[in-house]
Amino acid sequence: SCRTAPLGAPGSKLIPYKSPDKAQSNDIAGTGFGLLPFLAAGITHKPAAKKSSVDYSKTVMGGINYLIRKQGKDGNYGGGLYAHPLVTIAMCEAYGMTSDPLIKVSAQKAIDYLIYAQHDGGGWRYSPKQAGDTSVTGWCVMALKSGQMAGLKVPAERYKLVEKYLDSVHDAKSGGYGYTDPGNSPVMTAVGMLCRQYMGVNPRNPGLLKGVDILKKVHPGVNPAGYNMYQIYYATQVMHHMGGEAWDFWNLGPESNGQRKNGVRDILISKQVNANKGKFMVAGSWEPGTAGHAESGGRLMATSLSMLTMEVYYRHLPLYRREMGGAKN
């Protein structure tokens, strides 16, 4: 199980927070990143049946209403094809949990826009119909999967196209994935592997097992340079679905003298900011760092991904139900 106590703290700081970071402003993406941790914790725009000390339903409602207002007639929320799938995931999650008909209309239009924007080669990039890159494609695949799980219409052939794209960036020798060409970038490998898992690839698939070895080498408890929240977010989902020793290694840390330590969950908890910095309300957040998209995404993205990563423990059921020899954590 995961220690979840810290998850309550960031939410209360997420909305009123004023950032001292120099991150580029993208209100669409920011709203998506702000909503997702609430939704992943089961908090929607509907008031909770049991009154808690703080009711975040109005905060979630405000974010959803903002996104619906921003959505174009073509279904695009704006902010580019990084922001659109991110927001689509949030809207699909909100609809899936509430069956709100207004959200259904918006979410289906958003899915339809993604289908329109997909390149013939199977991927997505910054503009509609542009030849894909693995990073944007990963968000789009998660959006389609969220829509499918919420009961929205997602044509099955779109996944076949995604497989075509993944094949084009997969390095069979290493088991890794590249950004636009075959490679073994750890972060792109995590994205590619998660997409494959969503496509139903067998957990014993040699390519997946090779990919696990790539991810183990960038475990932040083994390699401090591996502390990249974008990478950790995807890799945690991958390892969670793999289960067994792969998950134990990732979650609890490498084994030494019969014990595991420096697992991802403990590293994330230790890095949560405990106090404000002057006038800036940063308590409960995570520092953006410098790896990957951290500087452009800023503190909000780092905090959102950190929370979503820890919510994997109780939000996602492992895709692979078979026993693979690991501890039950």
Please report, for each region that a protein language model flagged, where it lies by residue:
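Preference for long, amphipathic alpha-helical scaffolds in soluble/luminal domains
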Residues: 1-329
